[in-house]
Amino acid sequence: MTAKKSQESPMMKAAVFHHAYEPIPIENVPLKSLKESDVRVRIETCSVCHSDLQFVDRGLATFKEPPIILGHEIAGVVAETGKKATAFLPGDRVIVPASISCGTCIFCKSWNETQCENLKIPGNHIDGGYAQFIAVDQRHLTRLPEEFPFELGSLISNVLVGAYHLVFDRVNIRQGETVVIFGCGGFGLSVLQMAKLKQAHVYMVDIFDWKLNIARDYGANGVLNSNKCGVCEEGVCEMLKGKADVVIETIGTPRTLVQAINVLHKGGRMVLSGYADNTLPFLVSKIIMDEIKLIGSVGAPLREIPDVIKLIKDQKIRWKEMISNHFPLDKINEAFNTLRMGQSIRTVVHPNKTKI
């Protein structure tokens, strides 16, 4: 009698987050089966966002309870398609968006996809990009131009298109306005460049001189190391010779939130984009009496990705200086450490490489 062969599920390697304050282990996990309209993407790059550190280092809760695969800045190659996924072929280079909308709720139907009632963020609501593969419905994918490296695709998926959405849609920064950005990470540097396209006067605040030097090279009108001045707010106002029309806070700590609102003039707009679980550390009375507008900004609709791709093709956006380090998947904890130590703007993880 012949023994039946076991029907084992295909497996992949992934960095699986279980608990905060612990290293992330590499595990073998089953490949998810494809729905008819799904595309399986072989992940070439997933860059590390500071929000990933919030889960690991601060215990910020993911929407999906762990275990979960983190990572939301994803680019790769189509490996397999579902029966009705006809828009892409194996071998196509694609960008996976950092926020996935349902397309059917009242917000999606009114072109406000970032406010989707069923919004899914890879690495937060669903498994993300620190893995060899991800399955995504074909309607969420965007083609990555052949001349663009995969790490640029990862930047486009989140920080570049998110910055475009913030500047051109959520805030609509105007020519001649004074803008202060707290944080010279990938998002802050991307917002800087988008705001300069709107001919704003842009000033950057950070604690690392090497990042501020990149900001200056990217066109910042002024930079300030907040660790090298007595009172940050006084240093910013002296640099501006006044106060700001728009303040964009990309870090999310109570300290920087207070600093940000204190450099904003009456009637100004304060944008919150640093992902955190803090309560707001300033008085409601200040918002009321100064008639300050608080604006949240998260992600971007898929339709804005082609606009960002065109800006890059037209050489209006720089990005190479934002890529600081590269690591294979099994060095995921070392990759995270580069951000912890302030040694990186964007560190890129390559899930399907064993050596870099």
Model-predicted segments: where are they?
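Glycine-rich beta-strand-centered segment in the early N-terminal region that forms part
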Residues: 32-46, 59-106, 145-148
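NAD(P)H dinucleotide-binding glycine-rich loop of Rossmann-like/cofactor-binding domains
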Residues: 102-182, 320
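C-terminal hydrophobic helical "lid"/dimerization subdomain
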Residues: 2-10, 258-262, 302-356
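Residues in the short beta-alpha loop(s) of Rossmann-like NAD(P)-binding domains
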Residues: 20, 208, 276, 300
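Glycine-rich cofactor phosphate-binding loops and adjacent beta1-alpha1 units
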Residues: 171, 213-293, 355-356
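Mid-domain Rossmann-like dinucleotide-binding core that forms the NAD(H)/NADP(H) cofactor-binding site
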Residues: 146-229, 235
